[in-house]
Amino acid sequence: ACDPDWVAAVTHQLTTLGHTSNLYYTEPQTQLAKLLCERTGMKKVFFGNSGAEANECALKVARKYGEKDNRDVIVTLVNSFHGRTIATLAATGQDRFHEHFGPFPAGFRYTPANDIPALEAILSTGKVCGLLMEMVQGEGGVIPLDPAFVRKAEELCRANDILLMVDEVQTGNGRTGTLYAYEQFGIHPDVVTTAKGLA
């Protein structure tokens, strides 16, 4: 059976406004944006239609950020999964998802999860604009990142002026015990993507 509070909230919303494009202002969306900013410390919210679109937006933000000094490389982790669009597939660190769909956009590099020396090497090239990672890798298992690796990633991003981006499409919205999984690691990302649990 469904939670009665959830049923009441959904019923109320359906009698008010069932669905509309993100092009139009709606009060519930504004309230949600405010709540997300309050809970995360972020300053802006972008509402899209899917996790892939959220990650695609994060990739664009990183590229725009790096444009000022010709940095366009985005680093993700080996065995990551970031979506099924061409750019998010390029960001996905698994060869099996790359078969049959190339060529991909240039500028994506992969580093092994929990390998601090490899992370240091790739983030110190002067070409990286963003690091996108999942706190728990969910493709092929449930593999949480090592807290020391995550904290070092944040430190390296700050030292090298790289955007730290966290993909919380699978883990966000209370699915790991906190609103977002990154909170359990004591870090403060520049960009957080979310989707499924928010719906």
Q: Where do the language-model regions lie?
A:
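Conserved N-terminal phosphate-binding loop of PLP-dependent enzymes in the Aspartate aminotransferase
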Residues: 1-199
